[in-house]
Amino acid sequence: MQIAPLLHVGRGVMAIIGGGGKTTLMETLAGELSKKGKVIITTTTHIYRPEQYETLLDADEAAVSAALERSGIVCVASQAESGKLCAPRLSMGTLAQLADFVLVEADGAKRLPLKAHASHEPVIPEEAQRVIMVIGIDGVGKTIRETCHRSALYAQLALVDEETVVTPQLAARVVNAEGYGDRVYINKVESASDYEAAQAMANEFSCPVIAGSLHQGVYVCLH
């Protein structure tokens, strides 16, 4: 089963934001979309260097074009002092001219399922035609303090304290309060109880909602 059609991923630039699972979603989409055209994966913040793709650092247009001809999927970025990769020297608009699909990880969550966004986040490229909000269903049933990146801000947006247990409705309340994303993907939905929680969450959104498991490769449209 493929997730790209359910998320209506078209050609051009797409940003992925939210909780844990963004990198896996980006890599899953890259694999699917590479059957339809050339794919660039990149970031506007920081990501780990992907082992399975050719990575170009501070490359010019000619180098990117040549790599895409060789590989079909290429990571384009710069080297950050932290050892991670950061935003590339080339603009997103330029990358979109070189590849059919540009997938951008535009957020960080410290590998936690849920997050609230500080004033400087997310870093969504102005060229983005689709913004996917990722939510980890494994954050439901745990306290905000233990499962949310920027937990104090998350609690503030939810109008509760950090020891409050996250419910599907509470998680949706925070996403709706922030107003980011035109699609929601609920990840790690792998059991009947996960599905029930995901459906309860989806009922709170007005935008399309997809739920599933990137690990299992199974997805369903909930809204």
Describe each PLM feature range.
Residues 2-35:
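Walker A (P-loop) phosphate-binding motif
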Residues 12-16, 71-82, 106, 157-159:
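Short, basic, glycine/proline-bearing loop/turn elements
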Residues 16, 39-43, 75-78, 102-106, ...:
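General beta-strand structural signal in soluble alpha/beta enzymes
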Residues 19, 106, 136-138, 156-170, ...:
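G-domain G4 guanine-recognition motif of GTPases
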Residues 30-79:
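N-terminal phosphate/diphosphate-binding loop that engages ATP/GTP or pyrophosphate donors
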Residues 59-64, 146-162:
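Acidic, Ser/Thr-rich peripheral helices and adjacent loops at domain boundaries
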Residues 76-116:
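Phosphate-binding/switch loop-helix module in NTP-utilizing enzymes
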Residues 118-140, 150:
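Inter-motif core of Ras-like GTPase G domains
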